[in-house]
Swiss-Prot record:
Catalytic activity: a quinone + NADH + 5 H(+)(in) = a quinol + NAD(+) + 4 H(+)(out)
Subunit structure: NDH-1 is composed of 14 different subunits. Subunits NuoB, C, D, E, F, and G constitute the peripheral sector of the complex.
Membrane-protein topology: Peripheral membrane protein
Keywords: Cell inner membrane, Cell membrane, Membrane, NAD, Quinone, Translocase, Transport, Ubiquinone
A GO MF label: NADH:ubiquinone reductase (non-electrogenic) activity
Compartments reported by the entry: Cell inner membrane
Functional note: NDH-1 shuttles electrons from NADH, via FMN and iron-sulfur (Fe-S) centers, to quinones in the respiratory chain. The immediate electron acceptor for the enzyme in this species is believed to be ubiquinone. Couples the redox reaction to proton translocation (for every two electrons transferred, four hydrogen ions are translocated across the cytoplasmic membrane), and thus conserves the redox energy in a proton gradient.
Keyword Secreted in record: no
Name of protein: NADH-quinone oxidoreductase subunit D
One GO cellular component, as annotated: plasma membrane
EC number: 7.1.1.-
Organism: Cupriavidus pinatubonensis (strain JMP 134 / LMG 1197) (Cupriavidus necator (strain JMP 134))
Amino acid sequence: MADIKNYTLNFGPQHPAAHGVLRLVLELDGEVIQRADPHIGLLHRATEKLAEQKSWIQNVPYMDRLDYVSMMSNEHAYVMAIERLLGIEVPIRAQYIRVMFDEITRLLNHLMWIGAHALDVGAMAVFLYAFREREDMFDMYEAVSGARMHAAYYRPGGVYRDLPDTMPQYRASKVHNERAIKVMNEARSGSLLDFIEDFTNRFPKYVDEYETLLTDNRIWKQRLVDIGVVSPERALQMGFTGPMLRGSGIAWDLRKKQPYEVYDKMDFDVPVGVGGDCYARYLVRVEEMRQSNRIIKQCIEWLRRNPGPVITDNHKVAPPSRVDMKSNMEELIHHFKLFTEGMHVPEGEAYAAVEHPKGEFGIYAISDGANKPYRLKIRAPGFPHLAALDEMAKGHMIADAVTIIGTQDIVFGEIDR
């Protein structure tokens, strides 16, 4: 029999485990990876350049479409950068709403990650469970913004509107009979806060279900333990952030180290992994879901007790209320200018970073005093993680490449921008 020679394999961009449009050129020795070369750019939409043509406010929906699994976290960094340039204060209630939705977004992201990661490795049930929970969180997005995914809910100076007092109800259809609808609408009888609170009470039990299926599962551990090991020093050198850095044993979290909004008032822990392998990163993200649930509960408690404005009263930045606009000439002028020309942001530059579900998501905005950005640089957390794929996959089997891509939690919207 002839000796097995080195050969090259194209992985993706149509592979179900490629998480989008990853094209990976693998150089193999038998079934062992010698080199993994990621080819990016297949989802490049020139977001940074498009942002230079649109007004500051028109760019908010573009942010949703970067990492399209963690929509509101992207918006948050962008509006924070604008607020730093403008030097405006955000009402405290709006800050709590933002923090609450940041954590709901973290749950959305981590549920997508655990479902897809498990499916890649061969466990299908977790995927179905995770999407059951995501459905409830899409309803939360829809209640505040009208959109299930691309919310465009955050605004410079606050949020688009306050939390609604009612939730949409399901109606009987060919798919669900009256009895099923009654069960589905049980949690939807009150306000959005009631609905979110009901979800946070149920959620720890769901995380226990995922852990029952995976954490001590022999096959899961065989596929994840000692795969894609990254030392703490190497993780820092390669620019890792978020769960990828914490999985390697470094307790770095922007919510604790550089608190923004009201994170300094929140009581939560930062999970840190031991070992720096795929299993450590899995445990970190699972614990992060529990901590996010804690933060959401604290926000609900505060928001119930403290009504107030949810957007700045500076009408050069945020539109006046419809009542004021229709009864006051000055407010009408503000409204007209905002929705035609847009606001003018003072000359300067600002960098704002948030602890995005995937790591540090940063926006570096430069203004020349016009109504649109002079330059917008997006710091995507997934980019350095994907750049490390070659180093993490070297010496592993082809099947392990899928596990490593899964543990990196790659989304190409933000990498290709």
